[in-house]
Structures are given as structure tokens and as C-alpha cells.
């Protein structure tokens, strides 16, 4: 079996861009992948087409070999655009391989470690009561965990003391709304640059027993995050903006996090995520993949989560209506 073409489909259905990748073979099999939207999405599409020239005529089942061709073909270590493009192609290759063998992809990854995957939903709202109402809705939908930004939306334009008070009120309102049997994760979305301030937000939220504290600082600042990790007393989660085993090796070595959150549409693909998970397992860390993109990403994450022993929980985007639901 040989690769005969690789196509891209850039679509926008109202929630942002989606870049789908289609790998076509000479045996009437094709695979579908998706590349993460990193911002310059047209450039990601062009990167896929650039990589295609190296893959035409190759055996699509040699995924490790083809990954090395794509990654090593860059003179310098790749950034978000290259790794998003590689991820989209790599995921499509797994789709081809699963179809060729007539088995679900998770069977090619070692088989099932579990029968169910725990998920959480993001919640939000302008006021503490809005957050509480959305949290109650999530619980009524069957979720046993939710994630929220503890800080108010206008946190950059109000006094810091007020940010801390409002953060405590928001998390308290959600805890009171859902009770003690629902986990609450916190995600300031890497908006805090100063270690001391991130620690202060964590301290005012700690009484409400957060499941984890995500992107507590800028994700490239492993040293600052490691310093925070030593003091915080809440599990730190990060990794959505990082890619490849090489960056995650440095993250793990810095002892900056307890929970790793690679995005399979960005980190290098499914096999790269499995390698990251194996390193994490050896260091007694757990995995909670970043998954905000939609149904394709959720399907891919399903194969990863069901076959990964140190999986913790999966982000899940619930679309009850609109274009994404129809998709």
C-alpha cells in the first residue's frame, strides 16, 4: 500500500477554523486527521502540502518512519505550525492503519485499559451566580467534574485585591452549587505571569478543593512553574501549548507539573502522545488531554484514553445545538 495524495480541508463553522487532513492510498483506503488551529491556520494547511511531497509513494503503515521524515526534515526544531501539520497527517495515518487491519486504533496501541472514560466540561459566567448555574447544568447533564477560570473576565483592569476576592467568590459559588461529590478544576488560561500572584489565586481557591490548577503560569516558563509547584499544595496541570516528547521531557525533568495535558492535534500526534504518557507514567504523573476542538478530536482522544494506563480525565466539549452538533 502506498500514499498517493494528501488533501486538506479548511472549514469554519462558526466556532473557529478546523483543518482536516485526508491521506489517500492506492488501495482505496483513506484516513482522516485534523491539525490544531494555532492561529495562522492557512500556513498550517500549506505546511501539510509541503510535507506531502516527502510522503507520496511511502507505505502509510510505517507511521514511526514517516513521522521521523516529517520532523527531521525541518532544519530547526519545529514550532506550533509544523507540529500541528505533522499531527494532522499522523492521525490520518493511524486511521488508514486501523482500517487496513480491520480493528479500532486503540487495539494497535496495546488494547483497552478501561471501559469508560471520565470527562469534564468547561463552565463559565460573568458573575459567581452565573458560574454556579452553569455548573448545576453540567451536573444535570451527567458530568462529575467541571473546569472554570477562577478569575473574573475583567481581571486585568481592576485592583488585584478585588481579583482575589472575586476569584474566591466564583469558586465558592460553584462548590456550594455542586456539593462535595463533583470535582472543580481551575484554569486561569496562562493569564498570570507572576509566580506570587498565581500562588495568591491558588490560596484563595484552595479551601474549595480544586482537582487541579491548569496553566497557572506561562507554559514555556518551566522554572517558574516548578517554583510554584513546590509551594502550592494543589496538583498543577499543563501541556496544551507544548509539543513532542522533547519539550515534555524537559517539563517532566523540571518537576513543574503533576498532570500533563498534550493536545493530540498539536503535540505530534497519537504515537507522540503515547510516548509522552509513557514518560509520565515512569514519573508517576497522570494524563488529562487538552480537547477543545470538537468531535474528531474527541474520537482520537478516546483511543488514547482507553489505552493509556495513567489517564486521569478528558476535557469534553458538549455541543447541544448548532453546526458542531450537526457535524
Task: Give the label of every model feature segment.
Residues 1-32, 36, 320-326:
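Structured beta-strand/loop patches that form or line metal/cofactor-binding pockets in enzymes
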Residues 3, 28, 51, 89, ...:
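Conserved, mostly hydrophobic/aromatic
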Residues 90-126, 130:
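Glycine-rich, aromatic-flanked loop segments that form ligand/cofactor-binding clefts
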Residues 116-231:
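Metal-dependent enolase-superfamily TIM-barrel catalytic cores that perform enediolate-based chemistry
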Amino acid at each position: 500500500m502506498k500514499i498517493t495524495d494528501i488533501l486538506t480541508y479548511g472549514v469554519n463553522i462558526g466556532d473557529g477554523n478546523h483543518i482536516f487532513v485526508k491521506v489517500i492510498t492506492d488501495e482505496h483506503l483513506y484516513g482522516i486527521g485534523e491539525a490544531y488551529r494555532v492561529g495562522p491556520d492557512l500556513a498550517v494547511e500549506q505546511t501539510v502540502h509541503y510535507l506531502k511531497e516527502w510522503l507520496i509513494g511511502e507505505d502509510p503503515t510505517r507511521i514511526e518512519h514517516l513521522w521521523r521524515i516529517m520532523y527531521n526534515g525541518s532544519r530547526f526544531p519545529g514550532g506550533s505550525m509544523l507540529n500541528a501539520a505533522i499531527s494532522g497527517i499522523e492521525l490520518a495515518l493511524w486511521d488508514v492503519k486501523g482500517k487496513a487491519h480491520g480493528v479500532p486504533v486503540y487495539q494497535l496501541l496495546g488494547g483497552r485499559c478501561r471501559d469508560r472514560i471520565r470527562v469534564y466540561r468547561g463552565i463559565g459566567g460573568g458573575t459567581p451566580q452565573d458560574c454556579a448555574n452553569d455548573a448545576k447544568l453540567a451536573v444535570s447533564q451527567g458530568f462529575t467534574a467541571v473546569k472554570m477560570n477562577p478569575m473574573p473576565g475583567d481581571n486585568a483592569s481592576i485592583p488585584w485585591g478585588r481579583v482575589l476576592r472575586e476569584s474566591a467568590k466564583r469558586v465558592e459559588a460553584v462548590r456550594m452549587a455542586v456539593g462535595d461529590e463533583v470535582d472543580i478544576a481551575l484554569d486561569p488560561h496562562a493569564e498570570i505571569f507572576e509566580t506570587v500572584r498565581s500562588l495568591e489565586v491558588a490560596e484563595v481557591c484552595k479551601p474549595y478543593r480544586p482537582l487541579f490548577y491548569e496553566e497557572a503560569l506561562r507554559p514555556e516558563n518551566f522554572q517558574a512553574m516548578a517554583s510554584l509547584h513546590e509551594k502550592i499544595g494543589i496538583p498543577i496541570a499543563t501541556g496544551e501549548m507544548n509539543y513532542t516528547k522533547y519539550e515534555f521531557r524537559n517539563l517532566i525533568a523540571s518537576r513543574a507539573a503533576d498532570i500533563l495535558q498534550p493536545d493530540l492535534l498539536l503535540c505530534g500526534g497519537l504515537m507522540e502522545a503515547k510516548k509522552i504518557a509513557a514518560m509520565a507514567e515512569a514519573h508517576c504523573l497522570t494524563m488529562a488531554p487538552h480537547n477543545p476542538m470538537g468531535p474528531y478530536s474527541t474520537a482520537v482522544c478516546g483511543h488514547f484514553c482507553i489505552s493509556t494506563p495513567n489517564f486521569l480525565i478528558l476535557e469534553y466539549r458538549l455541543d447541544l445545538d448548532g453546526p458542531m452538533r450537526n457535524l
